[in-house]
């Protein structure tokens, strides 16, 4: 997963090169880089806007030095990722605000997961997320 910053300062999530890689493999045998950031429903062949919220959460984990599902090989993830566990375990030094924000990204049930507008209302470290973030 990649974070892109447009010339207008808009932050966007993307999967650089994923399209060509994904065409080569079935969903059961994905060999794409970045599967650690996929939402659980993506492995079932489903995609919703809230799937990008999950990916945003994994990007934040990576920025914090946490590799999502680091105990698993990427080839195991299509059967393991998000089925019964969040990729985030709060560490002692993680701020309460940041932890709360990240946890909003990782609800296993898509219908219960925050959407982008709800995330923008979550206060993080005393400041509101900029409305220029587009998923």
Give names to the regions the model predicted.
Residues 28-41:
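Conserved activation segment of eukaryotic-like protein kinases, specifically the C-terminal portion
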Residues 44-49:
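Activation segment
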Residues 52:
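Conserved catalytic-loop aspartate of Hanks-type protein kinases
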Residues 63-64:
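Hydrophobic anchor on a C-lobe helix of Hanks-type protein kinase catalytic domains
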Residues 93-106:
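Conserved C-terminal C-lobe helix
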Residues 107-132:
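Terminal C-lobe "cap" of eukaryotic-type protein kinase domains
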């Amino acid at each position: 997963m990649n974070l892109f910053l447009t010339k207008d300062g808009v932050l966007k999530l993307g999967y650089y090169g994923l399209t060509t890689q994904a065409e080569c493999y079935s969903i059961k045998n994905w060999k794409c880089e970045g599967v650690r950031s996929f939402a659980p429903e993506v492995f079932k062949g489903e995609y919703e806007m809230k799937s990008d919220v999950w990916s945003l959460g994994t990007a934040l984990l990576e920025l914090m030095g946490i590799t999502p599902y680091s105990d698993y090989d990427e080839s195991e993830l299509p059967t393991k990722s998000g089925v019964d566990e969040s990729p985030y375990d709060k560490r002692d030094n993680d701020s309460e605000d940041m932890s709360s924000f990240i946890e909003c990204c990782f609800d296993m049930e898509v219908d219960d997961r925050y959407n982008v507008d709800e995330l923008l209302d979550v206060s993080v470290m005393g400041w509101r997320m900029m409305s220029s973030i587009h998923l």
